[in-house]
Amino acid sequence: MDMAHERDASSEEEVMGGDLRRGPWTVEEDLLLVNYIAAHGEGRWNSLARSAGLKRTGKSCRLRWLNYLRPDLRRGNITPQEQLLILELHSRWGNRWSKIAQHLPGRTDNEIKNYWRTRVQKHAKQLKCDVNSQQFKDVMRYLWMPRLVERIQAAAAGQQQQQEGGTDTPPLSWQHGGSDGLYESPELPAPDASCWPAEYCAAAGGAQSGGTPAPELSSTTAGSSSLSTDSGAGAQPSWPTQADGAEWFTTACDASSATGGVAMRDTELELAQPPCQGGQTWTTSESSLPGLTFPDLAVADFEIGGFDVDSFWTSMEDDQLWCPTQAAV
C-alpha cells in the first residue's frame, strides 16, 4: 500500500514536472515548509510538498529542511571539539559523512564533508602529501589532534580562571592514565559543550570526578585514537588531563627544538612509511623523537619533502580551524 502510494506520488510529480519551481528557495516557501512541519511533522516528502502548497519536489523539501531549516541546526564555524571528533571518526570510518554527522548534533553530513575538503585536504596539499597517505595521517595524529586538545584545554582553563578571578594556570600536558594505556578526561569547555550529546558530557565529567569513566579508545592501532565502538551510540575521543612536570608539546617538530616532555617508551618500533608525493621518506630514530607522551608508540620525523612544519604552523595563524595555538582565553 505504502509503495503504491509512493509510486503514485512519484508519477504525479513527473506529470506536474513542468510546473515545479527550480532554483533558490524564497522566504515564503521556507515559511510554508516550516509551518506545515510544525503542525503535521515530517512525513512522506512528496505528499508533504503537495499538502504544504509547495511546487517543489519531495527531495528538494527534504534537503531544504534538513540542511537549512530544522531548528536544531548549529550555526557558525566548526568548533575545536567538533574538529577533533571529525578527525577521530574519519580515521575510523573514512568518508561516511552521514555516520559521522550522527555524532555531531546539529551538523549536517554536507557541512562535515565541506570542512574535510576545504580544510583538511587543503593542508595535505600544502604539505605536498596525499590526504590518505600515512604521512599525513601521522601529522594529524601527532600534531593536529594534540594541538586541538591543547586549545580545548586552554579555553577551559581560561574560563575557569575567569570564574575564579584566579591565578596563572600551569602548563598543559598529557598525563598517562594508568596501566591500561588510556588518558583521563577533563571537563569539556562550557561554551562548546552543546556540540556533544549529553551522554558525552556526562562521561567526560564522570572521568574527572571519579565516576563513570569516559568511553575508551581502542589500542589496536598504534598511534591512532580509534573509538572502541562502531555502534550508533556515543563516540568520543579520550581526553588528556593536566599534569605536573613534563610539558606535553612544543611548537617544534624535531628533538633539537623540543624543550621538554617524556619520550615514548617504545623506541624499537619504527615507522617505515612509503614516500610522499614530494619524494621524501620518513625515518624514526631515538634522537629525532619529539617530546611526546603517547604510551607504546613511535613517531615519524616530520620533515615532509624538506618542508618546515613549524613554519607551516606559524604561517597558518590566520586559519582558526587549523592552528590550535590561538587558544581562546
UniProtKB/Swiss-Prot annotation:
SMART domains, per the entry: SANT
Residues in the DNA-binding region annotation: 45-69, 97-120
Region (Disordered): 155-189, 206-242
Record-level GO BP terms: positive regulation of DNA-templated transcription; positive regulation of response to salt stress; positive regulation of response to water deprivation; regulation of DNA-templated transcription; response to cold
Sections of the chain in a coiled coil: none
Entry GO MF terms: DNA-binding transcription factor activity; sequence-specific DNA binding
Tissue specificity comment: Highly expressed in leaves. Expressed in roots and shoots. Expressed at low levels in flowers.
Keyword terms of this UniProt record: DNA-binding, Nucleus, Repeat, Stress response, Transcription, Transcription regulation
Gene3D superfamilies reported for this sequence: Homeodomain-like (1.10.10.60)
Organism name: Oryza sativa subsp. japonica (Rice)
Protein's name according to its UniProt entry: Transcription factor MYB2
PROSITE patterns the record matches: HTH_MYB
